[in-house]
Amino acid sequence: MALIDTRDLYKIYQVGDVEVRALNGVSVAIEQGEFVAVMGPSGSGKSTFMNILGCLDKPTRGTYILDGIDVTATDLSKLAGVRNRKIGFVFQGFNLIKRTSALENVELPMIYNHTPAAQRRKKAMQALEAVGLAQRADHLPNQLSGGQQQRVAIARSLVCDAPIIFADEPTGNLDTKMSIEVMDLFTRLNKEMGKTIILITHEPDIAQYATRLIKFKDGQKISDEKQIPCGAACMPKEDK
């Protein structure tokens, strides 16, 4: 059984007398350990699709099975628990709390899980070590570079041992050098830790890090192809 399996998903909004179909019959299966990039122009449905996959929203109709759980049949009140166990999120804006240290930011999801303090600190340090930032554990976000802040956000996505990481435009606020640093980290998490990575991006060079590329247009999946990742070799060269 696929880790993620959507069948004929629709998301329909009523705007006055107009019916807007943000998703129009999308079926996708993603296996454990895949690295998938999702691309499409603004309004293509890719963000709506990500919100449903991330248990942040539910489809109007269709079925979504997440690691054996029928998300579409699960009460919204219970989806937060499913989301916290199964999914880690990384966003373009980092979403770090400014007045707390890198370590405390990484600990945050475990507070919601009622993890004991000593265990929280240990797991948060392990996550920071995994992203190469253990030596920056006591630094505030404004004492870190953009790339380092995003690595803290990635560490935060790891601490609950979720099998899936959803990354929504994770390099959107980063220069080329920092983008390569972050994308190399995603590649390592995928290859060495077996994390399933689902990446939304509008940048073709960033999408080349993935082993599979899905494209959306007008609420529909228009292509779904395997690819050989070329990573940093596909990134534009910075001017000297």
Predicted regions and their residues:
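Conserved beta-strand-loop-alpha-helix hinge in the C-terminal portion
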Residues: 220-240
